[in-house]
Amino acid sequence: MSCQQNQQQCQPPPKCPPKCTPKCPPKCPPKCPPQCPAPCFPAVSSCCGPSSGSCCGPSSGGCCSSGAGGCSLSHHRPRLFHRRRHQSPDCCESEPSGGSGCCHSSGGCC
C-alpha cells in the first residue's frame, strides 16, 4: 500500500452535528400545592363505613372498632383465651357490615 492510501483510511470520522439546545423552562414556576391540614389517622370514609357504626382514630389505636366490639390494639398482646379471636395484634374482628376490619401497621384499616 502506498502512503497516500494509508492516510485516507486513517482520517478521523466527520464530526457529529451539534446537539439540539434544550428547550427553555416555562416562565412561570409551578404553583405550590395547597397546604394539607394536619395529618390524622385514616379518614373515617377510607376506614370504616358509617353503616357499620364504627369509627377509626387514636382512641381505638387506629383500628376500626365494630359494633360487636373488637379492636385488637397493636400494642396489646392477645391473651391466651383470645388467641383464636385475635390472629394478629394488628387486626380487628370482622365487622357486621362485611368489612374485614384488618388494621395495617400504619393504623389504616382495610
Curated annotation (Swiss-Prot):
Keyword terms of this UniProt record: Keratinization
Bias type Low complexity, positions: 1-10
Note: Belongs to the LCE cluster present on 1q21.
Tissue: Skin-specific. Expression was readily detected in adult trunk skin, adult arm skin, fetal skin, penal skin, vulva, esophagus and tongue. Not expressed in the cervix, rectum, lung, colon, or placenta.
A GO molecular-function annotation: identical protein binding
Protein name: Late cornified envelope protein 2C
Underlying gene: LCE2C
Keyword Signal appears in the UniProt entry: no
Function according to Swiss-Prot or TrEMBL: Precursors of the cornified envelope of the stratum.
Ranges of Pro residues composition bias in the record: 11-23
Induction / repression: By calcium and UVB.
The organism of origin for this protein: Homo sapiens
Signal peptide (from-to): none
Xref: InterPro entries: LCE (IPR028205)
One annotated GO biological process: keratinization
Homology family: Belongs to the LCE family.
UniProt subunit comment: Interacts with CYSRT1; the interaction is direct.
Top-level taxon in the UniProt lineage: Eukaryota
Region (Disordered): 1-23
